[in-house]
């Protein structure tokens, strides 16, 4: 058998790198396999890649060095001249400064005002001046009222009368003790009348039905 297998002719597949029977059926079946087709595709890709590299090398050799230098300088000049566009931010309006207590000028004494120039003007807030005036008017009115004792008495009397008028609707009425025994007598008379009426009432008994009569008669018969 070994001699027989050795006698069969074989060929070497350079794509798959294996030996195959040199018969038309065996060769056709091997070429139709996925492994053989994938190996052929890889070889063709390598050939195509090597051809592209060779073409690039030929182009680089054909271009002179002076041309490459000029292109490089042109590119560098373009990059140097390029500047990023500046962003234009919107202009912000300056905020108005609010007036504070530190900005107000306080008036000084007569000795200090002599040295200050005539153009300098002092400013006092109007609210403080008004409050001081109101306090002064209150003090004057209180002093006047204390000096006139008669007026204060009249005023107190008027206030008391007004309070009495306002509390007129809420006065408590006094109880009359004379009416209390009369109410007790009336209640006693009513209770007596109710007792008499209960005594005079006639009580009507309900008639028994036929079944109840028979039951009661049977009970009486058994007892006898």
Curated annotation (Swiss-Prot):
<feature type="compositionally biased region" description="Basic residues">
    <location>
        <begin position="87"/>
        <end position="98"/>
    </location>
</feature>
<dbReference type="GO" id="GO:0045292">
    <property type="term" value="P:mRNA cis splicing, via spliceosome"/>
</dbReference>
<dbReference type="GO" id="GO:0003723">
    <property type="term" value="F:RNA binding"/>
</dbReference>
<dbReference type="Pfam" id="PF06220">
    <property type="entry name" value="zf-U1"/>
</dbReference>
<dbReference type="InterPro" id="IPR013085">
    <property type="entry name" value="U1-CZ_Znf_C2H2"/>
</dbReference>
<feature type="compositionally biased region" description="Low complexity">
    <location>
        <begin position="108"/>
        <end position="122"/>
    </location>
</feature>
<dbReference type="InterPro" id="IPR000690">
    <property type="entry name" value="Matrin/U1-C_Znf_C2H2"/>
</dbReference>
<protein>
    <recommendedName>
        <fullName>Uncharacterized protein C18H10.07</fullName>
    </recommendedName>
</protein>
<dbReference type="GO" id="GO:0005730">
    <property type="term" value="C:nucleolus"/>
</dbReference>
<dbReference type="InterPro" id="IPR040023">
    <property type="entry name" value="WBP4"/>
</dbReference>
<feature type="compositionally biased region" description="Basic residues">
    <location>
        <begin position="203"/>
        <end position="216"/>
    </location>
</feature>
<dbReference type="GO" id="GO:0005634">
    <property type="term" value="C:nucleus"/>
</dbReference>
<feature type="compositionally biased region" description="Low complexity">
    <location>
        <begin position="67"/>
        <end position="80"/>
    </location>
</feature>
<keyword id="KW-0539">Nucleus</keyword>
<keyword id="KW-0863">Zinc-finger</keyword>
<feature type="region of interest" description="Disordered">
    <location>
        <begin position="67"/>
        <end position="158"/>
    </location>
</feature>
<keyword id="KW-0479">Metal-binding</keyword>
<dbReference type="GO" id="GO:0008270">
    <property type="term" value="F:zinc ion binding"/>
</dbReference>
<dbReference type="GO" id="GO:0071011">
    <property type="term" value="C:precatalytic spliceosome"/>
</dbReference>
<dbReference type="GO" id="GO:0008380">
    <property type="term" value="P:RNA splicing"/>
</dbReference>
<dbReference type="InterPro" id="IPR036236">
    <property type="entry name" value="Znf_C2H2_sf"/>
</dbReference>
<feature type="zinc finger region" description="Matrin-type">
    <location>
        <begin position="11"/>
        <end position="42"/>
    </location>
</feature>
<keyword id="KW-0862">Zinc</keyword>
<feature type="compositionally biased region" description="Basic and acidic residues">
    <location>
        <begin position="175"/>
        <end position="199"/>
    </location>
</feature>
<dbReference type="GO" id="GO:0071005">
    <property type="term" value="C:U2-type precatalytic spliceosome"/>
</dbReference>
<feature type="region of interest" description="Disordered">
    <location>
        <begin position="172"/>
        <end position="224"/>
    </location>
</feature>
<dbReference type="InterPro" id="IPR003604">
    <property type="entry name" value="Matrin/U1-like-C_Znf_C2H2"/>
</dbReference>
């Amino acid at each position: 058998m070994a001699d027989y297998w050795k006698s069969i002719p074989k060929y070497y597949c350079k794509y798959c790198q294996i030996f195959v029977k040199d018969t038309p059926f065996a060769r056709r079946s091997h070429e139709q396999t996925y492994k053989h087709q994938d190996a052929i595709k890889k070889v063709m890709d390598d050939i195509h890649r090597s051809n592209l590299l060779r073409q690039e090398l030929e182009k680089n050799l054909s271009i002179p060095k002076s041309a490459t230098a000029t292109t490089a300088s042109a590119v560098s000049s373009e990059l140097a001249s390029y500047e990023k566009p500046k962003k234009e931010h919107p202009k912000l309006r300056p905020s108005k400064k609010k007036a504070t207590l530190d900005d107000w000028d306080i008036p000084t004494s007569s000795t200090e005002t002599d040295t200050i120039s005539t153009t300098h003007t002092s400013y006092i807030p109007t609210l403080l001046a008004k409050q001081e005036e109101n306090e002064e008017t209150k003090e004057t009115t209180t002093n006047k009222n204390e000096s006139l004792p008669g007026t204060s008495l009249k005023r107190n009397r008027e206030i008391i009368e007004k309070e009495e008028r306002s509390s007129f609707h809420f006065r408590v009425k006094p109880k009359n003790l004379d009416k209390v025994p009369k109410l007790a007598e009336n209640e006693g008379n009513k209770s007596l009348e109710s007792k008499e009426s209960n005594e005079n009432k006639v009580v009507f008994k309900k008639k028994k039905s036929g079944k109840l009569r028979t039951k009661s008669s049977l009970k009486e018969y058994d007892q006898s």
